[in-house]
Amino acid sequence: LWSGVAAKFLSYFKFLQYKHAHRILCWSPEVFMTSAAKGIPEGASAIIPRLFCRDVVAEIDFCINTFGAVERVRRPGPDQRAAHALLTIGPAMIMIEAEWPGLPSRPPTPDGSSPVVIYVYVEDVDKTVERAIAAGAKVLFPVQNQFWGDRIGWVMDPSGHVWTIATRIEETTEEERQARLSRIMAESKK
């Protein structure tokens, strides 16, 4: 069983071989097997979320239309449909992946339940949430100011991924945040 999973995993990376011209990534099975480890690739984020989706192109379009993401890499799967993409949103990276037999990750369930929420900072949360809605997102929590100094709104994209979209509107100290939270907690008990 595990040898079959490993073979599928390696075949998955065979079609994902890529060398990005902007020094982002250089991955292939051969690199993993024969090159010395370099830790974090030059130009890469230490943590890169991988969003598994039923429709990779729709998720790419959502990220571009909502966040102004830049598509850096797109690779087809065995069926020639888009199966992998690397996007950047500001300095952050995000990978969009198709479902792949044998891998332990799946897209969110149709009801949108997911153990992961992506928190993304933008220049204008209100306009970004409007763009998200225009791109097919559903508002989960409307945009409002928070005690820690962010203005945030929660949306679920058409693929079922949940995003907290935020703009920092006020710099606060930990003491200020604690005092505000204490007031909120006291008011909620009334």
Placement of each model-derived feature along the sequence:
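Short, Lys/Arg-enriched N-terminal segments with co-localized hydrophobic residues
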Residues: 12, 16-32
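Extreme N-terminal basic, low-complexity initiation segments
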Residues: 1-10
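Short acidic-aromatic low-complexity motifs
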Residues: 53-57
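Short stretches within intrinsically disordered, low-complexity N-terminal or propeptide regions
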Residues: 8-9, 23, 71, 139
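Position-driven detector of the extreme protein N-terminus
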Residues: 2-3, 17, 28, 96
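C-terminal catalytic core of tyrosine-transesterase DNA break-rejoin enzymes
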Residues: 159
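Vicinal oxygen chelate
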Residues: 32-50, 60-61, 67-156, 165-190
